[in-house]
Amino acid sequence: MDGFIIINKKENMTSRDVVNIVCKKLHTKKVGHTGTLDPMAKGVLVIAVNKALKLVDDITSLNKEYIAEVTLGIKTDTLDITGNVLEKEDITNINKEFIEEVLNSFIGEYNMEVPIYSAVKVNGKKLYEYAREGKSVELPIKKVVINNIELLSVDQ
């Protein structure tokens, strides 16, 4: 079989877990994906099988859409909800208009330092492995383009 499989990845699974399952089910080792989703993330994971692997770079260069849930006023050591809370801040006077203004400031093209808790590899090793070992490493810079951003709802 050659082609793509669209999988709705569940929470608490790595993208690699999904690839391994597909490898076993299809009895092939030529399986990959078009982009890692964090283990706590759920959503579409595009799986490429055999000859379709040649098209992965073309697909990863396309625009993507994300829906994210954000908790304001908390900073963690992993930059996500799974980490240890380092700081808490009172956000009672932050309103919807302010949040929309901040979100809109992200629209455009810019360079972003890749977070240390990331599957991006440096010297053949995933950044989150360096972070878990307490080792510092020069973080790569990635070009980011945000064409549109929309606030769907605010819960108090």
Language model region names:
Residues 1-156:
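Catalytic/RNA-binding core of pseudouridine synthases
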